[in-house]
Curated annotation (Swiss-Prot):
It holds the Pfam family DHO_dh. Monomer. It comes from Escherichia fergusonii (strain ATCC 35469 / DSM 13698 / CCUG 18766 / IAM 14443 / JCM 21226 / LMG 7866 / NBRC 102419 / NCTC 12128 / CDC 0568-73). GO terms for biological process: 'de novo' pyrimidine nucleobase biosynthetic process; 'de novo' UMP biosynthetic process. The gene is pyrD. One of its GO terms (molecular function) is dihydroorotate dehydrogenase (quinone) activity. It catalyses: (S)-dihydroorotate + a quinone = orotate + a quinol. It is found in: Cell membrane. Catalyzes the conversion of dihydroorotate to orotate with quinone as electron acceptor. It is an enzyme of class 1 (oxidoreductase). Substrate binds at residues 66, 111-115, 172, 177, 246-247. This is Dihydroorotate dehydrogenase (quinone).
Length: 336
Protein backbone atom coordinates (compact mmCIF):
# COMPACT_ATOMS: atom_id res chain seq x y z
CA UNK A 1 0.00 0.00 0.00
CA UNK A 2 1.19 3.50 -0.84
CA UNK A 3 0.39 5.14 2.52
CA UNK A 4 3.85 4.67 4.14
CA UNK A 5 5.30 6.79 1.33
CA UNK A 6 2.54 9.39 1.68
CA UNK A 7 3.07 9.52 5.42
CA UNK A 8 6.82 9.97 5.02
CA UNK A 9 6.21 12.99 2.80
CA UNK A 10 3.49 14.46 5.02
CA UNK A 11 5.59 14.03 8.16
CA UNK A 12 8.21 16.32 6.63
CA UNK A 13 5.63 19.10 7.02
CA UNK A 14 4.39 20.85 10.13
CA UNK A 15 1.45 18.72 11.42
CA UNK A 16 -1.22 21.32 10.75
CA UNK A 17 0.23 22.14 7.34
CA UNK A 18 0.18 18.41 6.52
CA UNK A 19 -3.47 18.27 7.57
CA UNK A 20 -4.32 21.31 5.43
CA UNK A 21 -2.50 19.87 2.41
CA UNK A 22 -4.24 16.50 2.76
CA UNK A 23 -7.66 18.11 3.02
CA UNK A 24 -6.90 20.35 0.06
CA UNK A 25 -6.38 17.20 -2.03
CA UNK A 26 -9.43 15.43 -0.57
CA UNK A 27 -11.60 18.48 -1.26
CA UNK A 28 -10.52 18.36 -4.89
CA UNK A 29 -11.67 14.77 -5.34
CA UNK A 30 -14.69 14.63 -3.02
CA UNK A 31 -17.85 14.19 -5.05
CA UNK A 32 -15.88 13.52 -8.27
CA UNK A 33 -14.87 10.31 -10.11
CA UNK A 34 -11.39 10.77 -8.62
CA UNK A 35 -12.81 9.52 -5.30
CA UNK A 36 -11.92 6.12 -6.76
CA UNK A 37 -8.30 6.92 -5.86
CA UNK A 38 -9.10 6.55 -2.14
CA UNK A 39 -12.01 4.10 -2.36
CA UNK A 40 -11.52 0.70 -0.80
CA UNK A 41 -13.95 -2.17 -0.45
CA UNK A 42 -14.54 -3.22 3.14
CA UNK A 43 -16.86 -5.95 4.43
CA UNK A 44 -20.40 -5.03 5.43
CA UNK A 45 -20.81 -5.89 9.12
CA UNK A 46 -24.00 -4.16 10.31
CA UNK A 47 -24.28 -3.03 13.92
CA UNK A 48 -27.36 -1.56 15.61
CA UNK A 49 -26.67 1.29 18.01
CA UNK A 50 -28.82 4.17 19.32
CA UNK A 51 -31.67 3.01 17.08
CA UNK A 52 -29.48 3.36 13.97
CA UNK A 53 -27.92 0.73 11.72
CA UNK A 54 -24.20 1.25 11.09
CA UNK A 55 -22.84 -0.65 8.06
CA UNK A 56 -19.76 -1.54 10.10
CA UNK A 57 -18.61 -0.77 13.66
CA UNK A 58 -15.70 1.55 12.75
CA UNK A 59 -16.19 5.31 12.60
CA UNK A 60 -14.04 8.38 12.09
CA UNK A 61 -13.81 10.40 15.30
CA UNK A 62 -14.60 14.11 15.42
CA UNK A 63 -11.81 16.63 14.92
CA UNK A 64 -10.39 15.53 11.58
CA UNK A 65 -13.09 16.99 9.32
CA UNK A 66 -14.27 19.87 11.47
CA UNK A 67 -16.32 21.60 8.75
CA UNK A 68 -17.63 18.57 6.86
CA UNK A 69 -15.59 19.39 3.77
CA UNK A 70 -14.51 15.88 2.77
CA UNK A 71 -17.38 13.63 3.86
CA UNK A 72 -17.66 11.70 0.59
CA UNK A 73 -13.91 11.14 0.13
CA UNK A 74 -13.57 9.91 3.72
CA UNK A 75 -16.67 7.77 3.30
CA UNK A 76 -15.15 6.13 0.22
CA UNK A 77 -12.37 4.79 2.45
CA UNK A 78 -14.85 2.49 4.19
CA UNK A 79 -15.89 4.14 7.46
CA UNK A 80 -19.24 2.90 8.79
CA UNK A 81 -19.80 6.32 10.31
CA UNK A 82 -18.17 9.74 10.12
CA UNK A 83 -18.36 12.28 12.92
CA UNK A 84 -17.74 15.82 11.69
CA UNK A 85 -17.05 18.83 13.91
CA UNK A 86 -16.59 20.01 16.56
CA UNK A 87 -18.63 22.90 15.19
CA UNK A 88 -19.78 26.01 17.06
CA UNK A 89 -22.61 28.49 16.38
CA UNK A 90 -20.22 31.15 15.08
CA UNK A 91 -16.94 30.78 13.17
CA UNK A 92 -13.82 31.03 15.32
CA UNK A 93 -10.08 30.80 14.57
CA UNK A 94 -9.13 28.56 17.49
CA UNK A 95 -5.95 28.94 19.49
CA UNK A 96 -2.68 30.44 18.26
CA UNK A 97 -0.37 28.31 16.11
CA UNK A 98 1.55 26.09 16.50
CA UNK A 99 -1.18 24.03 18.15
CA UNK A 100 -0.72 20.48 16.84
CA UNK A 101 2.31 18.34 17.68
CA UNK A 102 3.45 14.82 16.82
CA UNK A 103 4.97 12.43 19.34
CA UNK A 104 6.35 10.17 16.62
CA UNK A 105 8.00 7.56 18.88
CA UNK A 106 4.76 7.08 20.83
CA UNK A 107 2.51 7.39 17.76
CA UNK A 108 0.62 10.11 19.59
CA UNK A 109 -0.56 13.65 18.96
CA UNK A 110 -0.98 16.64 21.23
CA UNK A 111 -3.44 19.28 20.10
CA UNK A 112 -4.67 22.55 21.49
CA UNK A 113 -6.69 23.50 18.41
CA UNK A 114 -9.49 25.19 20.36
CA UNK A 115 -12.52 24.36 18.18
CA UNK A 116 -11.25 26.18 15.09
CA UNK A 117 -14.13 25.96 12.59
CA UNK A 118 -16.08 27.99 10.05
CA UNK A 119 -19.36 27.87 11.97
CA UNK A 120 -22.47 25.72 11.89
CA UNK A 121 -24.09 27.38 8.86
CA UNK A 122 -21.04 26.62 6.70
CA UNK A 123 -20.98 23.01 7.91
CA UNK A 124 -24.64 22.53 6.97
CA UNK A 125 -23.99 23.72 3.42
CA UNK A 126 -21.22 21.13 3.13
CA UNK A 127 -23.45 18.37 4.53
CA UNK A 128 -26.16 19.22 1.98
CA UNK A 129 -23.68 18.57 -0.85
CA UNK A 130 -22.52 15.19 0.50
CA UNK A 131 -23.80 11.81 -0.71
CA UNK A 132 -22.32 9.62 2.02
CA UNK A 133 -24.51 6.58 2.72
CA UNK A 134 -23.16 5.78 6.19
CA UNK A 135 -24.21 7.33 9.50
CA UNK A 136 -23.17 10.98 9.79
CA UNK A 137 -22.60 12.27 13.31
CA UNK A 138 -22.29 15.99 13.97
CA UNK A 139 -20.25 17.00 17.00
CA UNK A 140 -21.17 20.35 18.58
CA UNK A 141 -19.51 22.65 21.11
CA UNK A 142 -19.61 26.16 22.49
CA UNK A 143 -17.80 29.23 21.21
CA UNK A 144 -14.75 30.24 23.23
CA UNK A 145 -16.18 33.69 24.01
CA UNK A 146 -19.50 32.31 25.26
CA UNK A 147 -19.43 32.26 29.08
CA UNK A 148 -19.63 28.72 30.48
CA UNK A 149 -22.80 29.71 32.37
CA UNK A 150 -24.47 30.37 29.00
CA UNK A 151 -22.77 27.47 27.25
CA UNK A 152 -25.93 25.41 26.90
CA UNK A 153 -27.38 28.10 24.62
CA UNK A 154 -24.63 27.39 22.06
CA UNK A 155 -25.46 23.68 22.06
CA UNK A 156 -29.16 24.43 21.57
CA UNK A 157 -28.44 26.85 18.70
CA UNK A 158 -26.38 24.16 16.95
CA UNK A 159 -29.00 21.48 17.60
CA UNK A 160 -31.71 23.64 16.02
CA UNK A 161 -29.67 24.01 12.84
CA UNK A 162 -28.14 20.55 12.40
CA UNK A 163 -31.03 18.35 13.54
CA UNK A 164 -32.50 17.66 10.05
CA UNK A 165 -29.08 16.69 8.68
CA UNK A 166 -27.55 14.57 11.46
CA UNK A 167 -27.67 10.80 11.89
CA UNK A 168 -26.74 11.45 15.52
CA UNK A 169 -25.59 14.50 17.48
CA UNK A 170 -22.48 14.40 19.70
CA UNK A 171 -22.27 16.82 22.62
CA UNK A 172 -18.63 17.75 23.24
CA UNK A 173 -18.19 18.79 26.87
CA UNK A 174 -14.76 17.25 27.27
CA UNK A 175 -12.24 19.09 25.12
CA UNK A 176 -9.41 20.36 27.34
CA UNK A 177 -8.73 23.27 24.95
CA UNK A 178 -11.77 25.49 25.59
CA UNK A 179 -11.47 27.17 29.00
CA UNK A 180 -14.03 25.89 31.49
CA UNK A 181 -15.67 23.44 29.07
CA UNK A 182 -14.92 20.32 31.12
CA UNK A 183 -16.78 21.81 34.11
CA UNK A 184 -19.98 21.00 32.19
CA UNK A 185 -19.30 17.30 32.93
CA UNK A 186 -20.02 17.69 36.61
CA UNK A 187 -23.01 17.84 38.97
CA UNK A 188 -25.70 20.44 38.48
CA UNK A 189 -24.02 21.93 35.40
CA UNK A 190 -24.28 18.56 33.61
CA UNK A 191 -27.86 17.97 34.75
CA UNK A 192 -28.88 21.45 33.64
CA UNK A 193 -27.29 20.95 30.21
CA UNK A 194 -28.78 17.49 29.68
CA UNK A 195 -32.29 18.64 30.64
CA UNK A 196 -32.07 21.47 28.11
CA UNK A 197 -30.69 19.20 25.39
CA UNK A 198 -33.31 16.51 25.98
CA UNK A 199 -36.14 19.07 25.90
CA UNK A 200 -34.74 20.50 22.65
CA UNK A 201 -34.48 17.00 21.18
CA UNK A 202 -38.14 16.33 22.02
CA UNK A 203 -39.22 19.64 20.44
CA UNK A 204 -37.19 19.02 17.29
CA UNK A 205 -38.50 15.46 16.99
CA UNK A 206 -42.05 16.84 16.76
CA UNK A 207 -41.07 19.53 14.25
CA UNK A 208 -39.05 17.27 11.93
CA UNK A 209 -40.95 14.02 12.53
CA UNK A 210 -37.75 12.09 13.14
CA UNK A 211 -35.74 11.09 16.20
CA UNK A 212 -32.04 11.98 16.12
CA UNK A 213 -30.12 10.31 18.98
CA UNK A 214 -27.82 12.27 21.28
CA UNK A 215 -24.42 11.01 22.46
CA UNK A 216 -22.29 12.82 25.06
CA UNK A 217 -18.50 12.78 24.68
CA UNK A 218 -16.60 12.50 27.97
CA UNK A 219 -12.99 12.95 29.11
CA UNK A 220 -10.63 10.14 30.14
CA UNK A 221 -9.44 12.13 33.16
CA UNK A 222 -12.55 11.61 35.31
CA UNK A 223 -12.12 10.24 38.82
CA UNK A 224 -14.01 7.11 39.87
CA UNK A 225 -16.60 9.22 41.68
CA UNK A 226 -17.01 11.60 38.75
CA UNK A 227 -17.45 8.70 36.33
CA UNK A 228 -20.21 7.20 38.49
CA UNK A 229 -21.98 10.57 38.61
CA UNK A 230 -21.70 11.06 34.84
CA UNK A 231 -23.10 7.58 34.18
CA UNK A 232 -25.99 8.26 36.56
CA UNK A 233 -26.80 11.57 34.86
CA UNK A 234 -26.73 10.07 31.36
CA UNK A 235 -29.15 7.33 32.39
CA UNK A 236 -31.49 9.64 34.34
CA UNK A 237 -31.81 12.03 31.41
CA UNK A 238 -32.33 9.26 28.83
CA UNK A 239 -29.29 10.19 26.76
CA UNK A 240 -28.94 7.79 23.82
CA UNK A 241 -25.22 7.05 23.95
CA UNK A 242 -21.84 8.03 25.34
CA UNK A 243 -18.57 8.55 23.47
CA UNK A 244 -15.56 7.56 25.58
CA UNK A 245 -13.14 9.21 25.44
CA UNK A 246 -11.73 12.55 24.38
CA UNK A 247 -8.02 13.42 24.70
CA UNK A 248 -6.11 13.30 27.99
CA UNK A 249 -4.05 15.80 29.98
CA UNK A 250 -2.04 12.92 31.49
CA UNK A 251 1.57 12.74 30.25
CA UNK A 252 2.79 9.83 32.37
CA UNK A 253 3.36 7.52 29.38
CA UNK A 254 5.23 10.04 27.22
CA UNK A 255 7.69 11.55 29.69
CA UNK A 256 10.96 12.61 28.08
CA UNK A 257 9.67 12.49 24.52
CA UNK A 258 9.91 15.39 22.13
CA UNK A 259 6.84 17.68 22.45
CA UNK A 260 5.57 15.83 25.55
CA UNK A 261 5.37 19.08 27.56
CA UNK A 262 3.20 20.92 25.03
CA UNK A 263 -0.12 22.14 26.43
CA UNK A 264 -3.19 20.39 25.06
CA UNK A 265 -4.91 17.04 24.80
CA UNK A 266 -2.90 13.88 24.13
CA UNK A 267 -4.33 11.29 21.74
CA UNK A 268 -3.06 8.20 19.97
CA UNK A 269 -1.43 5.06 21.33
CA UNK A 270 -0.57 6.54 24.78
CA UNK A 271 -4.32 7.02 25.38
CA UNK A 272 -5.32 3.42 24.60
CA UNK A 273 -5.09 1.90 28.10
CA UNK A 274 -6.61 4.90 29.87
CA UNK A 275 -9.61 5.19 27.56
CA UNK A 276 -10.20 1.43 27.61
CA UNK A 277 -10.27 1.44 31.41
CA UNK A 278 -12.81 4.29 31.41
CA UNK A 279 -14.95 2.26 28.97
CA UNK A 280 -14.71 -0.82 31.19
CA UNK A 281 -15.79 1.08 34.31
CA UNK A 282 -18.47 2.99 32.43
CA UNK A 283 -19.84 -0.28 31.04
CA UNK A 284 -20.08 -1.68 34.55
CA UNK A 285 -21.96 1.40 35.75
CA UNK A 286 -24.29 1.60 32.76
CA UNK A 287 -25.00 -2.13 32.73
CA UNK A 288 -26.30 -2.07 29.16
CA UNK A 289 -28.68 0.86 29.67
CA UNK A 290 -27.01 2.91 26.93
CA UNK A 291 -24.34 2.07 24.36
CA UNK A 292 -20.72 3.20 24.43
CA UNK A 293 -18.78 4.41 21.40
CA UNK A 294 -15.15 3.65 22.18
CA UNK A 295 -12.37 5.96 21.02
CA UNK A 296 -8.83 6.67 22.14
CA UNK A 297 -5.61 5.11 20.91
CA UNK A 298 -7.04 2.56 18.48
CA UNK A 299 -4.31 1.81 15.95
CA UNK A 300 -4.75 -1.93 15.36
CA UNK A 301 -7.30 -4.74 15.27
CA UNK A 302 -6.20 -5.78 18.77
CA UNK A 303 -6.77 -2.27 20.15
CA UNK A 304 -10.24 -2.15 18.57
CA UNK A 305 -11.10 -5.58 20.01
CA UNK A 306 -9.96 -4.42 23.45
CA UNK A 307 -12.41 -1.52 23.32
CA UNK A 308 -15.27 -3.84 22.32
CA UNK A 309 -14.31 -6.38 24.99
CA UNK A 310 -14.38 -3.54 27.55
CA UNK A 311 -17.97 -2.71 26.57
CA UNK A 312 -17.98 -0.55 23.43
CA UNK A 313 -20.61 -1.22 20.75
CA UNK A 314 -18.87 0.93 18.14
CA UNK A 315 -15.31 2.24 17.86
CA UNK A 316 -13.74 5.32 16.27
CA UNK A 317 -10.24 6.24 15.10
CA UNK A 318 -8.39 9.50 14.55
CA UNK A 319 -4.69 9.52 15.50
CA UNK A 320 -4.29 5.89 14.41
CA UNK A 321 -5.67 6.94 11.03
CA UNK A 322 -3.02 9.68 10.79
CA UNK A 323 -0.21 7.24 11.55
CA UNK A 324 -1.51 4.17 9.66
CA UNK A 325 -3.71 5.66 6.93
CA UNK A 326 -6.67 4.12 5.06
CA UNK A 327 -5.30 0.54 5.28
CA UNK A 328 -6.12 0.63 9.02
CA UNK A 329 -9.83 0.99 8.19
CA UNK A 330 -9.91 -2.14 6.05
CA UNK A 331 -7.74 -4.06 8.51
CA UNK A 332 -10.00 -3.30 11.48
CA UNK A 333 -13.34 -3.78 9.73
CA UNK A 334 -12.20 -7.06 8.12
CA UNK A 335 -10.96 -8.57 11.37
CA UNK A 336 -13.01 -7.05 14.18
Amino acid sequence: MYYPFVRKALFQLDPERAHEFTFQQLRRITGTPFEALVRQKVPVKPVSCMGLTFKNPLGLAAGLDKDGECIDALGAMGFGSIEIGTVTPRPQPGNDKPRLFRLVDAEGLINRMGFNNLGVDNLIENVKKAHYDGVLGINIGKNKDTPVEQGKDDYLICMDKIYPYAGYIAINISSPNTPGLRTLQYGEALDDLLIAIKNKQNDLQKIHQKYVPIAVKIAPDLSEEELIQVADSLVRHNIDGVIATNTTLDRSLVQGMKNCDQTGGLSGRPLQLKSTEIIRRLSQELNGRLPIIGVGGIDSVIAAREKIAAGATLVQIYSGFIFKGPPLIKEIVSNI
